[in-house]
C-alpha cells in the first residue's frame, strides 16, 4: 500500500513538523592535523577588523599590539572592532538606570564568592594549556604543576587553598626576575637484551631544571593555546578555539561570576539558564512585546546573526565595563576583576604544532614547528599560506603570536552578553524618544530583536538605529544573515519560536542509542535519555514506547545478550542459555544476562537492578552485587554518574543518570603504550593527584555544608575533619570506643609523620 506522505501532516500543526526536517544523520566532521592555519586565519582577521587602530609595543614582552578602541567611526557596513569607550560607558549607565542597584548587588554577591572559592575550582574543565610543559594537559594536572613550580620558587600564598590566594601568587610571579621549572624529557639508547640477545631500545625518563627569564615567563603566562574545534556541523571550514593557562583562568572565573550574577537579573539574557527555564524567560519578553503592540502597532522580529562576534570584541572595552560596574567597590575587588581583561589585552596565541610537509613521492614527511615560521623560506608554501605567514610574521615571538584585539571563542560569554543586553535596553521609548521601540534576547553572540512601530517605515528606522548603536560598541549585526518575520516566528539559540517554543525533538536523536561505556551504564543512560525527552522535548508516549523497544533491541545486539530462550546464535548465547536454564526466576535476570525487558514508559526512572531486585534468585543477587568479584575492577561507587550526551546542535550536554554498581559496571583497562614514553612521569603524577583529590572529596563531599575553612593544608583539613566526624559518630553510638581510639591514633600518627617530613 502506498502512503501519500502529505496525509501524515493533515492533522499536524505546521510548527510540529520541524522534527521531520532533521539534516544531521551521519557523524559530525572532526579535524585532523594541525590547527596552525586556522589560528593564523583568526589572528589575521582580528587584526584586519581593527587595522585602523594604534600600534604600540608591550614594554615587558616586546610584542607589537594593535589598539582599535575609540578608532574611526564606521563609514560603511564592513565589520569593525572600533568600540567607543564613552558609548559603552553610557550604555552601562542606562542599563543601571533601568535596573536600579543591579551592579551594586552583583558586586556584593561576587565578593562573597571570591572569599569562599577554593583553588580546586580550577581543576574543573578539560584540556588546559600547561605553561610548565608548554602543551595541553588535563586541568587538574596543569594546576598541580603550576602550584608545584610556584612553591619551589618561594610563592606559598596558595597553601591556604583559597583561589584568591593562589591568584596573589600569580601576580607576584609576574614580578619575579626568573622562574625555575622542571621539565620531563626522554633518553633512548640501544642495549642488548640478556635473555633474547637481541638489540632493544631502552628508554629512560629524566627531569631537568630550566630557568625562564621574566620575559619568557610572561609570554607563557599570557599564552592561550589553540586547537581546532571538533564536531562542528554545517560548516565548510574548521575554526580555532583557545584554551588559556592557569594564570588567566582564575581571574576569568571571577569576572564571569560577576557577569553571570548580572545576567541572572536581566530578563533579556539567555544566559546562564538553559532548557525549559530559558524558554520560559524568553517567552516572557515575546509576550510583553506582543501584548504592547496593540492593534495600532506593527511588531517584527529579527532572527539575528552577528559577524565574527569574538574577533570584534575587545578586552579593553571589558576593562571599561568592569571599571564602571565596580566603581563604588573596595580597591582590592576592582583590582582582582580588572586583571583578566588586562591580561587579555596582552594575550599571545600559540600557533599549535606547525605545518606538515610531504615530499612528492610521499616517502618523506617533516614537520615545520611554529617557531620556525619566522625564518623559513616561503617558497615551500602555496599562495594562500604564504600570504598568511607574511601577514603574521611581524607579530611572531617564539612560535606565539601577539593578539591584543579580539576575545577568542568562549572566554567572556557572560560579560559580552551584558554588553549586548545593554544595547537592547536602549530600545525603550524613553530612550528612543520617538514612535519606534525595541526589545529582544541576547545569549553570548546570538540575538533576537523585536521592533515595534506604527508603520513599516518606523520598523525600518528602528532596525537601522539598533544596527548603528551596536556598531558603536563593536557589535556587527550581519545584514546578510539576519532576517525579519512578523513577531511570533523566530529562532534563537536553536530554539524555534512559533506562538510558543516548538519542541524540536529530532535535535536529540544522536543521543539515542547505546553509549558504549559498559552494560550497566549503557542501560541506565539509554532509558534516562528517553525519560528526559518525554519531560523536555514533547516525546509522546507511543513514540517513547517505540524508542524504548528499539533501544532494547540495539542494546541486545551490541552486547550480544539476546533473551535466554531466543533462537539467535551469538558468541555469548551458549553461556546465557545455560544461565537461563539454571535460573528459577527468569524475570529477575538483567537484560544484559539474557533476561526479559521489564521497562515501560512508567518506570524509566528506576535503575534496572532495583526494578528486578525482588524477582532475582538469591545466588544471582550475590553474584551480581559482589564488590569482591575478582573479575571486575570497580568504579568508585557513586549514587549519581554523569554522561556526556551529544545533541545534533550546540554543545555536548552533561546528563545525570542513576548508577547502581554491579559486576556489570566494569572499566576497560588503560592502554599500556603510554607507559614507555616521557609521558609516563606525567601520568603517574596525574594518578597520584587524582587519588588525593578523590580522598579529599570523600572527606568533604560537595554536598557537605562543612567546607574546610581557614588556612590549612589538604592533609590538616582531612585530619581535623576525621576527628570531628569520629567524635560525632562515637557520641551518637554509631562507632565503638575501640574504633574511636583507633581513628584518633591514626590521626596523631599522620600529624607526626608530617612534622618529621
From Swiss-Prot:
Keywords: Eukaryotic host gene expression shutoff by virus, Eukaryotic host transcription shutoff by virus, Host cytoplasm, Host gene expression shutoff by virus, Host nucleus, Host-virus interaction, Inhibition of host RNA polymerase II by virus, Nucleotide-binding, Nucleotidyltransferase, Phosphoprotein, RNA-directed RNA polymerase, Transferase, Viral RNA replication, Viral transcription. Phosphorylated by host PRKCA. It is found in: Host nucleus; Host cytoplasm. Its main location: host cell. Pfam families: Flu_PB1. GO terms for biological process: DNA-templated transcription; symbiont-mediated suppression of host gene expression; symbiont-mediated suppression of host mRNA transcription via inhibition of RNA polymerase II activity; viral RNA genome replication; viral transcription. Residues 55-64 have a biased composition (Polar residues). It comes from the Viruses. One of its GO terms (molecular function) is nucleotide binding. A motif (Nuclear localization signal) lies at residues 187-195, 203-216. One of its GO terms (cellular component) is host cell cytoplasm. Its EC number is 2.7.7.48. Residues 249-256 are annotated as: Promoter-binding site. Residues 286-483 form the RdRp catalytic domain. It catalyses: RNA(n) + a ribonucleoside 5'-triphosphate = RNA(n+1) + diphosphate. Residues 50-82 are annotated as: Disordered. Influenza RNA polymerase is composed of three subunits: PB1, PB2 and PA. Interacts (via N-terminus) with PA (via C-terminus). Interacts (via C-terminus) with PB2 (via N-terminus); this interaction is essential for transcription initiation. RNA-dependent RNA polymerase which is responsible for replication and transcription of virus RNA segments. The transcription of viral mRNAs occurs by a unique mechanism called cap-snatching. 5' methylated caps of cellular mRNAs are cleaved after 10-13 nucleotides by PA. In turn, these short capped RNAs are used as primers by PB1 for transcription of viral mRNAs. During virus replication, PB1 initiates RNA synthesis and copy vRNA into complementary RNA (cRNA) which in turn serves as a template for the production of more vRNAs. Belongs to the influenza viruses polymerase PB1 family. This is RNA-directed RNA polymerase catalytic subunit. It comes from Influenza A virus (strain A/Leningrad/134/1957 H2N2).
Amino acid at each position: 500500500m502506498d502512503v501519500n506522505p502529505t496525509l501524515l501532516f493533515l492533522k499536524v500543526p505546521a510548527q510540529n513538523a520541524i522534527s521531520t526536517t532533521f539534516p544531521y544523520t551521519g557523524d559530525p566532521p572532526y579535524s585532523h592535523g594541525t590547527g596552525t592555519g586556522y589560528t593564523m586565519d583568526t589572528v589575521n582577521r582580528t587584526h584586519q577588523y581593527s587595522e585602523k587602530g594604534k600600534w604600540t609595543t608591550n614594554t615587558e614582552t616586546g610584542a607589537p599590539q594593535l589598539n582599535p578602541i575609540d578608532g574611526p567611526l564606521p563609514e560603511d557596513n564592513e565589520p569593525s572592532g572600533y568600540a567607543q569607550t564613552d558609548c559603552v560607558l553610557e550604555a552601562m549607565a542606562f542599563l543601571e538606570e533601568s535596573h536600579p542597584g543591579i551592579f551594586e548587588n552583583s558586586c556584593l554577591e561576587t565578593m562573597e564568592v571570591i572569599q569562599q572559592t577554593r583553588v580546586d575550582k580550577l581543576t574543573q574543565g578539560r584540556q588546559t594549556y600547561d605553561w610548565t610543559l608548554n602543551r595541553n594537559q588535563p586541568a587538574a594536572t596543569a594546576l598541580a604543576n603550576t602550584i608545584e613550580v610556584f612553591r619551589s620558587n618561594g610563592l606559598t600564598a596558595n597553601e591556604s587553598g583559597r583561589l584568591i590566594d593562589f591568584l596573589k601568587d600569580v601576580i607576584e610571579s609576574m614580578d619575579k626576575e626568573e622562574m625555575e621549572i622542571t621539565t620531563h624529557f626522554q633518553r633512548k639508547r640501544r642495549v642488548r637484551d640478556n635473555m633474547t640477545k637481541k638489540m632493544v631500545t631502552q628508554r629512560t625518563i629524566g627531569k631537568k631544571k630550566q630557568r625562564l627569564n621574566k620575559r619568557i615567563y610572561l609570554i607563557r603566562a599570557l599564552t592561550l593555546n589553540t586547537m581546532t574545534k571538533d564536531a562542528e556541523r554545517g560548516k565548510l571550514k574548521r575554526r580555532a578555539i583557545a584554551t588559556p593557562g592557569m594564570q588567566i583562568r582564575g581571574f576569568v572565573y571571577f569576572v564571569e561570576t560577576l557577569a553571570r550574577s548580572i545576567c541572572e537579573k536581566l530578563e533579556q539574557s539567555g544566559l546562564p539558564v538553559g532548557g525549559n527555564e530559558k524558554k520560559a524567560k524568553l517567552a516572557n519578553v515575546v509576550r510583553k512585546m506582543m501584548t504592547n503592540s496593540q492593534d495600532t502597532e506593527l511588531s517584527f522580529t529579527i532572527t539575528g546573526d552577528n559577524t565574527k562576534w569574538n574577533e570584534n570584541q575587545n578586552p579593553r572595552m571589558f576593562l571599561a565595563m568592569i571599571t564602571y560596574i565596580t566603581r563604588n567597590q573596595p580597591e582590592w575587588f576592582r583590582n582582582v576583576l580588572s586583571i583578566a581583561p588586562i591580561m587579555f589585552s596582552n594575550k599571545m596565541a600559540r600557533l599549535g604544532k606547525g605545518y606538515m610537509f610531504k615530499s612528492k613521492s610521499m616517502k618523506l614527511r617533516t614537520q615545520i614547528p611554529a617557531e620556525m615560521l619566522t625564518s623559513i623560506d616561503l617558497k615551500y608554501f602555496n599562495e594562500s599560506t604564504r600570504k598568511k605567514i607574511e601577514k603574521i610574521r611581524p607579530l611572531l615571538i617564539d612560535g606565539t603570536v601577539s593578539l591584543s584585539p579580539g576575545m577568542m571563542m568562549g572566554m567572556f560569554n557572560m560579560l559580552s552578553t551584558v554588553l549586548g543586553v545593554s544595547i537592547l535596553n536602549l530600545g525603550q521609548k524613553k530612550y528612543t524618544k520617538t514612535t519606534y521601540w525595541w526589545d529582544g534576547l541576547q545569549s553570548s553572540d546570538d540575538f533576537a530583536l523585536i521592533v515595534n512601530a506604527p508603520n513599516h517605515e518606523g520598523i525600518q528606522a528602528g532596525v537601522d538605529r539598533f544596527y548603528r548603536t551596536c556598531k558603536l560598541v563593536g557589535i556587527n549585526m550581519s545584514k546578510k544573515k539576519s532576517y525579519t518575520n512578523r513577531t511570533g516566528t523566530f529562532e534563537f539559540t536553536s530554539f524555534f519560536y512559533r506562538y510558543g517554543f516548538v519542541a524540536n525533538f529530532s535535535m536529540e536523536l544522536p543521543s539515542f542509542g547505546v553509549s558504549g561505556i559498559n552494560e550497566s551504564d549503557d542501560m541506565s543512560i539509554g532509558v534516562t535519555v528517553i525519560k528526559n525527552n518525554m519531560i523536555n522535548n514533547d516525546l509522546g508516549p507511543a513514540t517513547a514506547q517505540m524508542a524504548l523497544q528499539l533501544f532494547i533491541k540495539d542494546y541486545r545486539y551490541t552486547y550480544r545478550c539476546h533473551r535466554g530462550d531466543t533462537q539467535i546464535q551469538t558468541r555469548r548465547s551458549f553461556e546465557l542459555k545455560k544461565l537461563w536454564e539454571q535460573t528459577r526466576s527468569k524475570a529477575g535476570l538483567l537484560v544484559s544476562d539474557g533476561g526479559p525487558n521489564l521497562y515501560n514508559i512508567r518506570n524509566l526512572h528506576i535503575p534496572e537492578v532495583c526494578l528486578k531486585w525482588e524477582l532475582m534468585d538469591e545466588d544471582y543477587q550475590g553474584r551480581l552485587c559482589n564488590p569482591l568479584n575478582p573479575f571486575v575492577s570497580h568504579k568508585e561507587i557513586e549514587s549519581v554518574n554523569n554522561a556526556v550526551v551529544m545533541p545534533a546542535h550546540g554543545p555536548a550536554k552533561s546528563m545525570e543518570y542513576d548508577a547502581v554498581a554491579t559486576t556489570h559496571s566494569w572499566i576497560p583497562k588503560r592502554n599500556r603504550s603510554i607507559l614507555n614514553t616521557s609521558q609516563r612521569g606525567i601520568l603517574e603524577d596525574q594518578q597520584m593527584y587524582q587519588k588525593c583529590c578523590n580522598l579529599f572529596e570523600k572527606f568533604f563531599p560537595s554536598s557537605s555544608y562543612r567546607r574546610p575553612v581557614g588556612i590549612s593544608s589538604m592533609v590538616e583539613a582531612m585530619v581535623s575533619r576525621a576527628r570531628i566526624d569520629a567524635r560525632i559518630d562515637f557520641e551518637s553510638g554509631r562507632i565503638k570506643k575501640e574504633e574511636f581510639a583507633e581513628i584518633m591514633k591514626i590521626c596523631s600518627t599522620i600529624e607526626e609523620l608530617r612534622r618529621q617530613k
